[in-house]
């Protein structure tokens, strides 16, 4: 078999007159009665191959048997197309290949999905036949983008003198957040490894080990409820460094992301990135990962609501809640009563009891709650919300967390529906000064807002024992267009501070020693100050490639139920395998 001389998408007018050897898949076959045209595809693109009896009867006879997705080896001569046959939509649209020989390397059944960017296949079918789905150019281009992003990051970190170090996949189960995936040990009866949720502890131990600068393209595993932007196994760019301040880490990440955007996407972005505290983000956007590509910020009306005539507002404030509103500029005529009812049902998903609304008309406020506001109150509302005729005012009165969640989500929905979002923008943002701990009323205990190894502000360390809810974290999240790209922090590196953190989280001294004794002991051998960040590679690629589903950036992803439709994993295993592991199944009976 002759070697391939050209990739299909790279045969240009410079090759006219040359004999070329091409290999690829049949994208399309057209029989024009005596002439057969085949679009031959490989990962670089498509080239048109012509089978003409005047050139080769033998090649034409073979071409008559060829169908879509057959794998071919074609030998032929490159010729220029006639003036009326030029296709400027193709890189190879000015030439075609007159076939002199063709060899069918492999035949193909009729594929269950159309191999084209615009496929009509359902996602389940695409996942079941993922190897066919990956043939679509849009999928290849996504993974080329992923490769380019990863290569740029590796090159950047190499110039910054970081070492790429692999950390264990089989490790110890520790209570860090989500459920662990467990792996039974054959050698140690009744004991289990866990797949890592992140390399957090190992990268800190590498800092104890004096490596100073580490990174890893790390596989992580979390057994949690899945959403469109979550997978049970995912990849993060894991970075840790000793002796750097928070400012130095943020500056380095800005330089890295600027290079990624330029090299992998061809987009120039400016640094430093804007910064916003966690409290400010929640107050203004109702989200800890705000999309700043459009306005429509939340406005706090609690002070006004406390003295107004609308009892729903006043009672919310009196019970310790708040009232906030968003002004959808010029949207009054675009939302009917039925549309607003749909918005009301939408905010209820986020815990809101309802959605109050007003439309601003030339002669004042109109809507179900307009009667509760006299002229003076109406003027205050209009002024506070910067409202003018044609605006739609939307209010939620409830607990602070419910107000933030519901209005934050409503803001994003309105931004999309009103086409306020400039999709060409890439708005990076740092969200800083996070709370260190969050209180869970159901569990009646504190949980780490990020993870238990985050360093509090020095002046807040004592609050861990007196008022944990007031302690602030030296933590930072990188946000892009309303998505959390990653999170990081300075880490605790002193045993006494780490023990105070564990105590605030409800660990007894014995529990802390049992779970994290190896880390606590490591802190007694001269641990340097250190910090880092972990960036979600899958999510970053999703945003840069313009995809809407994280699964499109992972070669062989899982479904929302954490199953693989291609391999049918997870699956039962043989009884003999369980016996080797000294395991017995005790399945719950279906009710």
UniProtKB/Swiss-Prot annotation:
<dbReference type="InterPro" id="IPR006195">
    <property type="entry name" value="aa-tRNA-synth_II"/>
</dbReference>
<comment type="similarity">
    <text>Belongs to the class-II aminoacyl-tRNA synthetase family. Type 1 subfamily.</text>
</comment>
<dbReference type="InterPro" id="IPR004115">
    <property type="entry name" value="GAD-like_sf"/>
</dbReference>
<keyword id="KW-0030">Aminoacyl-tRNA synthetase</keyword>
<keyword id="KW-0648">Protein biosynthesis</keyword>
<dbReference type="InterPro" id="IPR004364">
    <property type="entry name" value="Aa-tRNA-synt_II"/>
</dbReference>
<protein>
    <recommendedName>
        <fullName>Aspartate--tRNA(Asp/Asn) ligase</fullName>
        <ecNumber>6.1.1.23</ecNumber>
    </recommendedName>
</protein>
<comment type="function">
    <text>Aspartyl-tRNA synthetase with relaxed tRNA specificity since it is able to aspartylate not only its cognate tRNA(Asp) but also tRNA(Asn). Reaction proceeds in two steps: L-aspartate is first activated by ATP to form Asp-AMP and then transferred to the acceptor end of tRNA(Asp/Asn).</text>
</comment>
<feature type="region of interest" description="Aspartate">
    <location>
        <begin position="200"/>
        <end position="203"/>
    </location>
</feature>
<dbReference type="InterPro" id="IPR029351">
    <property type="entry name" value="GAD_dom"/>
</dbReference>
<dbReference type="GO" id="GO:0005524">
    <property type="term" value="F:ATP binding"/>
</dbReference>
<feature type="binding site">
    <location>
        <position position="176"/>
    </location>
    <ligand>
        <name>L-aspartate</name>
    </ligand>
</feature>
<keyword id="KW-0547">Nucleotide-binding</keyword>
<dbReference type="InterPro" id="IPR047089">
    <property type="entry name" value="Asp-tRNA-ligase_1_N"/>
</dbReference>
<dbReference type="GO" id="GO:0050560">
    <property type="term" value="F:aspartate-tRNA(Asn) ligase activity"/>
</dbReference>
<dbReference type="Pfam" id="PF00152">
    <property type="entry name" value="tRNA-synt_2"/>
</dbReference>
<dbReference type="InterPro" id="IPR004524">
    <property type="entry name" value="Asp-tRNA-ligase_1"/>
</dbReference>
<dbReference type="GO" id="GO:0140096">
    <property type="term" value="F:catalytic activity, acting on a protein"/>
</dbReference>
<dbReference type="Pfam" id="PF01336">
    <property type="entry name" value="tRNA_anti-codon"/>
</dbReference>
<dbReference type="InterPro" id="IPR047090">
    <property type="entry name" value="AspRS_core"/>
</dbReference>
<keyword id="KW-0067">ATP-binding</keyword>
<dbReference type="GO" id="GO:0006422">
    <property type="term" value="P:aspartyl-tRNA aminoacylation"/>
</dbReference>
<dbReference type="InterPro" id="IPR002312">
    <property type="entry name" value="Asp/Asn-tRNA-synth_IIb"/>
</dbReference>
<dbReference type="GO" id="GO:0005737">
    <property type="term" value="C:cytoplasm"/>
</dbReference>
<feature type="binding site">
    <location>
        <position position="231"/>
    </location>
    <ligand>
        <name>ATP</name>
    </ligand>
</feature>
<feature type="binding site">
    <location>
        <position position="450"/>
    </location>
    <ligand>
        <name>L-aspartate</name>
    </ligand>
</feature>
<dbReference type="GO" id="GO:0004815">
    <property type="term" value="F:aspartate-tRNA ligase activity"/>
</dbReference>
<feature type="binding site">
    <location>
        <begin position="536"/>
        <end position="539"/>
    </location>
    <ligand>
        <name>ATP</name>
    </ligand>
</feature>
<dbReference type="InterPro" id="IPR012340">
    <property type="entry name" value="NA-bd_OB-fold"/>
</dbReference>
<dbReference type="Pfam" id="PF02938">
    <property type="entry name" value="GAD"/>
</dbReference>
<feature type="site" description="Important for tRNA non-discrimination">
    <location>
        <position position="84"/>
    </location>
</feature>
<dbReference type="GO" id="GO:0003676">
    <property type="term" value="F:nucleic acid binding"/>
</dbReference>
<dbReference type="InterPro" id="IPR004365">
    <property type="entry name" value="NA-bd_OB_tRNA"/>
</dbReference>
<keyword id="KW-0963">Cytoplasm</keyword>
<feature type="binding site">
    <location>
        <begin position="222"/>
        <end position="224"/>
    </location>
    <ligand>
        <name>ATP</name>
    </ligand>
</feature>
<feature type="binding site">
    <location>
        <position position="484"/>
    </location>
    <ligand>
        <name>ATP</name>
    </ligand>
</feature>
<dbReference type="InterPro" id="IPR045864">
    <property type="entry name" value="aa-tRNA-synth_II/BPL/LPL"/>
</dbReference>
<dbReference type="GO" id="GO:0016740">
    <property type="term" value="F:transferase activity"/>
</dbReference>
<comment type="subunit">
    <text>Homodimer.</text>
</comment>
<feature type="binding site">
    <location>
        <position position="491"/>
    </location>
    <ligand>
        <name>L-aspartate</name>
    </ligand>
</feature>
<keyword id="KW-0436">Ligase</keyword>
<feature type="binding site">
    <location>
        <position position="222"/>
    </location>
    <ligand>
        <name>L-aspartate</name>
    </ligand>
</feature>
């Amino acid at each position: 078999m002759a070697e391939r001389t050209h990739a299909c998408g790279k045969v240009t007018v410079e090759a006219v007159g040359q004999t070329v050897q091409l290999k690829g898949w049949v994208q399309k076959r057209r029989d024009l009665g005596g002439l057969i045209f085949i679009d031959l595809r490989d990962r670089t693109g498509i080239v048109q191959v012509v089978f003409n009896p005047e050139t080769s009867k033998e090649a034409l006879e073979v071409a008559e048997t060829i169908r879509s997705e057959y794998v071919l080896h074609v030998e032929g001569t490159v010729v220029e197309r006639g003036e009326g046959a030029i296709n400027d939509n193709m890189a190879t649209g000015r030439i075609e290949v007159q076939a002199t020989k063709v060899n069918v390397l492999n035949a193909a059944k009729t594929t269950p999905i159309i191999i084209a960017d615009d496929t009509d296949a359902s996602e389940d079918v695409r996942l079941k036949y993922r190897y066919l789905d990956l043939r679509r150019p849009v999928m290849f281009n996504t993974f080329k983008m992923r490769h380019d992003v990863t290569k740029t990051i590796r090159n950047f970190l190499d110039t910054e003198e970081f070492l790429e170090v692999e950390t264990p996949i089989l490790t110890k189960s520790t209570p860090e957040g989500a459920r662990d995936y467990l792996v039974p040990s054959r050698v140690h009866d009744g004991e289990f490894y866990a797949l890592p949720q992140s390399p957090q502890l190992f990268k800190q131990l590498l800092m104890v080990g004096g490596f100073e600068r580490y990174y890893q393209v790390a596989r992580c595993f979390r057994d949690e409820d899945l959403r469109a932007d979550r997978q049970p196994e995912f990849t993060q760019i894991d970075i840790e460094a000793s002796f750097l301040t928070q400012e130095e880490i943020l500056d380095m990440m800005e330089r890295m992301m600027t290079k990624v955007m330029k090299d992998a996407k061809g987009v120039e972005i400016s640094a430093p990135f804007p910064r916003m505290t966690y409290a400010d983000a929640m107050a203004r956007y109702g989200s800890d990962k705000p999309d700043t590509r459009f306005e429509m910020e939340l406005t706090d009306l609690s002070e006004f609501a406390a003295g107004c005539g609308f009892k729903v507002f006043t009672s919310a404030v009196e019970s310790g809640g708040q009232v906030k509103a968003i002004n959808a500029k010029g949207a009054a005529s675009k939302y009917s009563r039925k549309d607003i009812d749909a918005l009301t049902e939408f905010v209820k998903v986020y815990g809101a009891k309802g959605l109050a609304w007003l439309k601003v008309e030339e002669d004042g406020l109109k809507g179900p709650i307009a009667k509760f506001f006299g002229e003076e109150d109406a003027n205050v509302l209009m002024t506070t919300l910067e409202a003018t005729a044609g605006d739609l005012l939307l209010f939620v009165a409830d607990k602070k967390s419910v107000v933030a969640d519901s209005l934050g989500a409503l803001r994003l929905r309105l931004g999309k529906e009103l086409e306020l979002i400039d999709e060409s923008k890439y708005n990076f943002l740092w969200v800083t000064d996070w709370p260190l701990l969050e209180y869970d009323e159901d569990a009646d205990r504190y949980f780490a807002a990020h993870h238990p190894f985050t360093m509090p502000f020095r002046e807040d360390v004592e609050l861990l024992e007196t008022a944990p809810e007031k302690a602030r974290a030296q933590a930072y999240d990188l946000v892009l267009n309303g998505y959390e790209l990653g999170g990081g922090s300075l880490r605790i590196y002193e045993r006494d501070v780490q023990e105070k953190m564990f105590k605030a989280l409800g660990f007894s001294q014995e529990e802390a020693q049992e779970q994290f004794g190896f880390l606590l002991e490591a802190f007694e051998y001269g641990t340097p100050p250190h910090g880092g960040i972990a960036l979600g590679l899958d999510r970053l690629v999703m945003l840069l490639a313009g995809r809407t589903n994280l699964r499109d950036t992972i070669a062989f992803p899982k479904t929302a139920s954490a199953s693989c439709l291609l391999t049918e994993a997870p699956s039962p295993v043989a009884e003999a395998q369980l016996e080797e592991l000294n395991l017995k199944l005790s399945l719950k009976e279906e009710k």
